[in-house]
Amino acid sequence: MAFFAGISDWVAQRLQRNSETARLDLERAYEAALYITALETEYASGRSLRRLPSQLSARQQTSLQAELRQTLRSLRHYRQRYRRHQPVQLQAGLALGRPGMGMPTIAHEKLQLIEQVLARYGQPTVHSSNPDDSQLMTSKNNSKPVPDPESDDEYLISQTSFLPRSIFGAFADLRQQLDPKAEDQIVQNFRSRKGKTLIALRFVLLLVLVPLLTQQISKSFIVGPIVDRLRSQDPEAIFLNFQMEEEAFVKLNQYQQLLRFQHYLKEAPPLTEAEIDERVREKAEEIAVEYRQESSNAIKNIFADLISAAAFAILLISSQEEIQLLKSFIDEVVYGISDSAKAFIIILFTDIFVGFHSPHGWEVILESISRHFGIPENRSFIFLFIATFPVILDTIFKYWIFRYLNRISPSAVATYRNMNE
């Protein structure tokens, strides 16, 4: 009895390990399919990338083709590993167009997306001696067709074998581990991804530092001296707008009332009217200097920000390759996040920018921008902006979910709806 119990435990552990391996392979294949779908949406408006866009340069086309070929190779590899480790009755559900016995609906949706992506690019040649040398743009004569879901019997027969599929999976894993070129391939892939990641992070750092440094340097050494010299020629130009003048008047009036209040409470030595006028005049001069500097600072901000925006635009125009690497890096990071984390991030950002409390945040942002450029605050414009812009932003976001996210990640959309409810 102990012998049979040991065999039963070994079989159960083997099945559990195969199930976990199949789950990981499915997730990796699904991430590769999502990445290819994102490339199609970005470069070909959702169509296949068999024909690369003509507006891309030759170098960009080569880089995109290599990236697509590598991702397709990974997709086919993990899809094949998944088929080896997954029981046959679960794969039958995909061939019949419905979930198999014990297959979750989300896993079935992922398999459908994987098969749809592979169907758009065909299958690699069966007799190829080196799969790494297979071209991405293969013709129908040189590619193995994707199984037709309608031919159920033929598909199931082709997927069955005399020995259990897990045995072939174990031998395939062992052969891959004993391959003398496997370590070099892993190191090469790691170095390639590491280089792309460093370039993407360095470019993000440049996108942040270049505008900030340009704004500060131009404001301190170029725009600042010019504005100070021009405004010194007109001593009467103190206030940039009427709102600053009103604020200065309120401050001066409060100071005058404070002096009289302290005099009445006898907290300060008694002052004559002449002494009160003298102190008020000194305070007025301090306020005038303060608002003259604030007005000059607002003018400096306008020209310094224009120079900073020009530097940012030049950086974007001259860094097209870095932008492509940054997009690939962002896609890998985003598609590597779980569906629940994606839904959480989406809900967080939507509640911040278009949620119930977002009008207060938009009001603070608009007031800060107005003060930064020395523009008088227009309450009517602020309320009109708050009443229209978040609504437009919410409409764009819902359209993006309907057209884009619902197609590449239906499980994330389902999780988002459940969490939002």
From Swiss-Prot:
Highest rank taxon of the organism: Bacteria
Record keyword Nucleotide-binding present: no
Location of this chain's protein in the cell: Cell inner membrane
GO molecular function: proton transmembrane transporter activity
Pfam families the record matches: CemA
Chain intervals for the UniProt region annotation (Disordered): 124-153
Keyword annotations: Cell inner membrane, Cell membrane, Hydrogen ion transport, Ion transport, Membrane, Transmembrane, Transmembrane helix, Transport
Transmembrane segments annotated in the record for this chain: 203-223, 298-318, 345-365, 381-401
A GO-annotated cellular component: plasma membrane
Cited NCBIfam families: PRK02507.1-5 (NF002706)
Family: Belongs to the CemA family.
Function summary: Required for H(+) efflux immediately after light irradiation to form a rapid H(+) concentration gradient across the thylakoid membranes. Together with PxcL, contributes to transient H(+) uptake following dark to light transition.
Name this protein carries in UniProt: Proton extrusion protein PxcA
Species for this entry: Synechococcus elongatus (strain ATCC 33912 / PCC 7942 / FACHB-805)
Lineage, top ranks: Bacteria, Bacillati, Cyanobacteriota, Cyanophyceae, Synechococcales
Name of the coding gene: pxcA
